[in-house]
Curated annotation (Swiss-Prot):
Species, as recorded: Aspergillus clavatus (strain ATCC 1007 / CBS 513.65 / DSM 816 / NCTC 3887 / NRRL 1 / QM 1276 / 107)
UniProt function note: Component of the ERMES/MDM complex, which serves as a molecular tether to connect the endoplasmic reticulum and mitochondria. Components of this complex are involved in the control of mitochondrial shape and protein biogenesis and may function in phospholipid exchange. mdm10 is involved in the late assembly steps of the general translocase of the mitochondrial outer membrane (TOM complex). Functions in the tom40-specific route of the assembly of outer membrane beta-barrel proteins, including the association of tom40 with the receptor tom22 and small TOM proteins.
Keywords, comma-separated and alphabetical: Membrane, Mitochondrion, Mitochondrion outer membrane, Transmembrane, Transmembrane beta strand
PANTHER family: MITOCHONDRIAL DISTRIBUTION AND MORPHOLOGY PROTEIN 10 (PTHR28035:SF1)
The name this protein goes by in its record: Mitochondrial distribution and morphology protein 10
Taxonomic superkingdom: Eukaryota
Topological relation to the membrane, as annotated: Multi-pass membrane protein
InterPro entries: Mdm10
Subunit structure: Component of the ER-mitochondria encounter structure (ERMES) or MDM complex, composed of mmm1, mdm10, mdm12 and mdm34. Associates with the mitochondrial outer membrane sorting assembly machinery SAM(core) complex.
Free-text note regarding domains: Lacks alpha-helical transmembrane segments, suggesting that it resides in the membrane via beta-sheet conformations similar to those predicted for other outer membrane proteins and porin.
Length: 465
């Protein structure tokens, strides 16, 4: 489950119309959400609050052998008035990341005052004067400041500076500083990561620099198909999207070189929408699904993923990896199952409309020549009702060594709860394409892996206001 501060950062991206899907780093986001999820460690409590539309705080207390915790603060120049902050009102699908429906590329928003050098006070005064234009208050460069202090010693400080410098460009600076031992007189270890993103909708480029080993990097993504900046026929939206990307890294200090390339094919929401009129003859084509292919030439690694959303409440994903140099392979499969809140008896409609199989009935009716597609209702209320009806989700992940992870995430009264467990005959695969195993999975002496069937169990409880 996402932390509250990560949720606020996603709300900031939505408020500033930044498409996080149009990035090479998000190429395998769907498969990672279903296969590479992590389970809580022991007991952890989160208390958060969006005190004002511009300011948020979060406090964390955990027990992982020792008592530890963190304090986080966040400030945004963009007001987040429409962002639900109470844990009882936040849509669960916003926090429990599952199957990620890729959205079609969109053109950058051009109607903001991006050329202002300062967060102009006059813009806010004109709004209070009563002109009623909500975009006037946003006539500034959207900026986000975030800092987290991890305790106890050795304390670690993580800070983030995020700024939209133009409709197509975004700058982020991330700092990580760790204080040394109490008796050490050396300066704290610190590193800076700078990232400049350029997104035009048709393609995106990311330029990175890290002070750790003076690492330079580049990531790029290209979307095949029409350019969203020059729309042609808005009445026929695209039903699929093919994207190709690559990344490269180089460190002149350590003489390290890294690179990878990948493809992603995904269906878009228009592929499974209900026809809106009787003149529409396009049937429901398929389930929503996403295919990816990642190739790392220097290490000889090849990874493919296939994710499928079989129904609104059920999704599957699988991944196969192979290394041509070592002949090692990896196979991982996972799924998620959502449980919806049961409606009161007086609000229940036809049960056939809410069993998650309406897509199959529509698909069968499409083959009837006498069938006329009904007029589709407004999509916004349906989406809101779907978010409010989600009560919990169960995720399962298993690999070729029969290592199993179980994760349950749901709402209990006013609290958001995550509970997970890891089981298996051995530690998780140490291959380059899998998630590193936790420390509890590596327990045991000798030169080999410990044959432990219990990798750990944990519970995380969150409350926000």
């Amino acid at each position: 489950m996402l932390d509250f501060m990560d949720y606020i950062q996603l709300a900031f991206a939505e408020a500033t119309s930044w498409n996080r899907d149009n990035s090479y780093s998000s190429l395998t986001a769907t498969a990672q959400s279903l296969l590479d999820f992590s389970t809580p460690e022991r007991l952890r409590v989160h208390i958060s609050s969006l005190a004002t539309p511009h300011f948020a705080t979060s406090y964390t207390l955990g027990t992982v052998g020792l008592i530890d915790g963190s304090v986080s603060y966040l400030y945004s120049t963009v007001p987040l008035d429409n962002t639900p902050s109470r844990s009882a009102l936040i849509p669960l699908r916003k926090l429990a990341r599952g199957y990620r429906q890729v959205q079609p590329p969109v053109a950058p928003v051009e109607d903001w005052g991006w050329n202002s050098l300062l967060d102009g006070l006059g813009s806010f005064q004109s709004t209070h004067a009563g002109d009623g234009n909500t975009h006037v208050s946003l006539s500034q460069k959207a900026t986000l400041l975030h800092a987290t202090l991890h305790l106890p010693p050795p304390t670690t400080l993580n800070a983030l500076f995020l700024r939209r410098i133009s409709p197509t460009m975004q700058l982020s600076l991330a700092v990580c500083s760790t204080r040394g031992p109490p008796l050490s007189k050396s300066a704290p270890q610190a590193s800076l990561l700078g990232q400049l993103c350029h997104d035009t909708g048709k393609y995106s480029n990311e330029y990175l620099f890290s002070t750790d080993n003076s690492l330079f990097g580049w990531r790029g993504l290209w979307n095949f198909g029409p350019d969203p900046r020059h729309p042609r026929d808005p009445s026929s939206p695209p039903v699929s999207l093919l994207s190709a990307g690559a990344e490269a890294y180089y460190s002149p200090v350590s003489s390290l070189i890294g690179m990878s390339t990948g493809l992603r094919f995904s269906t878009l929401p228009a592929a499974t929408e209900t026809p809106s009129s009787t003149t529409t003859t396009t049937p429901i084509s398929t389930f929503p699904y996403t295919l990816t292919l990642i190739l790392t030439p220097l290490t000889g690694s090849l990874s493919t993923t296939y994710s499928l959303r079989a129904s609104p409440n059920l999704a599957f994903s699988s991944r196969f990896g192979f290394n041509v140099y070592s002949w090692e392979s990896e196979m991982v499969a996972g799924c998620e199952l959502w449980r919806r809140r049961r409606k009161p008896q007086h609000q229940q409609d036809d049960p056939a409309d809410h069993d998650g199989l309406e897509w199959a009935r529509r698909k069968m009716r499409m083959h009837d020549p006498d069938y006329a597609p009904p007029t589709a209702p407004a999509p916004a209320p349906v989406a809101a009702e779907s978010d409010e009806g989600n009560e919990s989700v169960l995720k399962i992940r298993v690999d070729q060594s029969w290592n199993v992870r179980l994760l349950w995430e749901g709402r209990v009264k006013e609290l958001l709860v995550s509970a997970g467990v890891g089981l298996g005959p051995s530690s998780f695969s140490p291959s380059s394409w899998s998630v590193p195993a936790s420390g509890s999975a590596q327990a045991g002496g000798g030169g080999g892996h410990a044959k432990s069937y219990w990798h750990g169990v944990g519970v995380s409880v969150s409350y926000s206001s």
